[in-house]
Amino acid sequence: MATTINPPRDPNTLSNYNNWLSTHITANFDILFDQKKLVGNVIHKLKSITNAESTDIVLDTSHVDVTDVKVDGKPSVWELLPPVKPYGTALKIKLDQGVKMDEIVHVDISVKTTEKCTALQWLTPAQTSNKKHPYMFSQCQAIHARSIFPCQDTPDVKSTIDFNITSPLPVIASGLLVRDASGAPQTGGKNLYQFHQKVPIPSYLFALASGDISEAAIGPRSVVATSPDKLRECQWELEADTENFINAIEKIVYPYVWGEYNVLILPPSFPYGGMENPIFTFATPSIISKDRENVDVIAHELAHSWSGNLVTNASWEHFWLNEGWTVYLERRILAAVHGEAYRHFSAIIGWKALSDSVDHFGHDHEFTRLITDLKGKDPDDAFSSIPYEKGFNFLFHLENLVGKQKFDQFIPHYFTKFKGKSLDSYEFKATILDFFKSDAEASKLLNELDWDTWFYAPGLPPKPKFDTSLVDVVYDLAKKWQSIPESSFKPQPSDIKDLTGNQIVVFLEQVLLFERPLAPELSKLMGEVYGLAKSANIEVANLYFRVGLNAGDESVFEPTADLLGKIGRMKFVRPLYRNLQKVNRPLAIETFEKNKDFYHPICRAMVEKDLFGKKDA
């Protein structure tokens, strides 16, 4: 019989998922706040995808304590192989004999997390908003699920999941709550919470949170969950837009398949803007700006319900298939709700983020390519706005190339063809070429496209012609500031009276681009006249502080350090530390040392690299 060869596409896993596929996971965990660990067991239902040729099952682990392994109910021989940085330690489970193609084995692993777990953050009551109870939450993307339990930690494998979680505090997970069974009292003052995820998902979408959490409706199929003292303001921020966003994207792709779309507003140390955990988006409290200006994050995470969660990149080398598509769909939602000019306005903000990332890495750096080479590398190190914005610009280019009307027909086709599957960039290319093969005009344009340059060239792509109608007014205002002291311009509060928060963001980004930074006294004047230093909108405040740091305005040094102790979102934290260390490195280091235990482990590691260079994990 011929040997079965299933080449693995993901270089960032140690698992032999080319021999076995995890099709269902049962996760039974007890949340132990006093010990800061999860204790329990996971059961993998694994399907053989060879003809009895594999007698080992290899799973990813990282800093987990495995205490027992059973295969089909019987004790098994197993070992932890030597660690392979940065991928952890492979768990090798021996089988008595190979298993025929498509036959199933059940692997039951008893496991505890350890203090080196990179996926979980444990907060003391003091780190929460009402300071009453401890809190824990997970962040598994990209390769951190393996630090909670042994798994095939690759986006190229999808499983359904049953969660059985006991905790003394309410629990949220990336599944639908079994309402009649959940909250059932257990011994020792704990309750059992059960969730089912019936749509197969990759390991990085496994999510748990537990703490003092209350819920309020923000739409007919949506709730917001957060600390009781913040519930009303979070509800107000999100209730106007959430259902409108869902209705808009359902018209662009197809109906939402996950049942509920809910949002968990996390404590401020959450390292990302949002994480698209299915059913419950995990989001930063920095979007609660009391002006509904930052709910674009919700449009983005909602769009992931199609791109990323249903149709998934096969490896992190093709991350643009998750994020580029999601930014594209997010901006289509914004266009449907606010008008086409707003889509272009958002894309202009995105182009600035893309330029910043390319400048940060260097214009010929590997990580500025659309398809990256991550063999032997940590996907977290490659994380930036490049897959988001270069990916968006590629899809926007394709839309303009074939025409929006035609591209609109391709969107549901693509998301139907790969629904429940993972794919790479080459399958994407083959799919769009095949879809348009009967359209001579579109087919010619797509075949003549320089795909290799888009896929592999580092640096910036060609800049599209954006509609600048919403940015021209702020470009003009920035030019007036640049003209001081040569001009007679006198700043007034009325300069920004009619601007949205996002327009003020673009204004400040323009000021950051000045070849000659503002004089310190002008930076200070800007903050005073426009009230920027006191803005409740962190998108605005953090950029104003960066303007001040660039100017060497000492009046922003302490407010910057103060903000760095209140928010853990890397979008703000990393640039602020980079700017602060240029003008006052001792303050930057002192601020980091003071707050490093407040930050999520992922954020802490990235800031350490920014401030001190490479450090061994």
From Swiss-Prot:
Pfam families: Leuk-A4-hydro_C (PF09127), Peptidase_M1 (PF01433), Peptidase_M1_N (PF17900). The active site is at residues 301, 388. GO terms for molecular function: aminopeptidase activity; epoxide hydrolase activity; metallopeptidase activity; zinc ion binding. Its EC number is 3.4.11.-, 3.3.2.10. It comes from the Eukaryota. Keywords: Cytoplasm, Hydrolase, Metal-binding, Metalloprotease, Nucleus, Protease, Zinc. SUPFAM superfamilies: ARM repeat, Leukotriene A4 hydrolase N-terminal domain, Metalloproteases ('zincins'), catalytic domain. InterPro entries: Aminopeptidase_N-like_N (IPR045357), Aminopeptidase_N-like_N_sf (IPR042097), ARM-type_fold (IPR016024), LTA4H (IPR012777), LTA4H_cat (IPR049980), M1_LTA-4_hydro/amino_C_sf (IPR038502), M1_LTA4H (IPR034015), Peptidase_M1 (IPR001930). It is an enzyme of class 3 (hydrolase). Binds 1 zinc ion per subunit. Its cofactor is Zn(2+). It is found in: Cytoplasm; Nucleus. Zn(2+) binds at residues 300, 304, 323. GO terms for cellular component: cytosol; fungal-type vacuole lumen; multivesicular body; nucleus; NVT complex. A peptide binds at residues 139-141, 271-276. It catalyses: an epoxide + H2O = an ethanediol. One of its GO terms (biological process) is lipid metabolic process. Its main location: cytoplasm. PANTHER family: LEUKOTRIENE A-4 HYDROLASE. NCBIfam families: leuko_A4_hydro. Aminopeptidase that preferentially cleaves di- and tripeptides. Also has low epoxide hydrolase activity (in vitro). Can hydrolyze the epoxide leukotriene LTA(4) but it forms preferentially 5,6-dihydroxy-7,9,11,14-eicosatetraenoic acid rather than the cytokine leukotriene B(4) as the product compared to the homologous mammalian enzyme (in vitro). Belongs to the peptidase M1 family. This is Leucine aminopeptidase 2. It comes from Aspergillus terreus (strain NIH 2624 / FGSC A1156). The lineage of its organism: Eukaryota, Fungi, Dikarya, Ascomycota, Pezizomycotina.
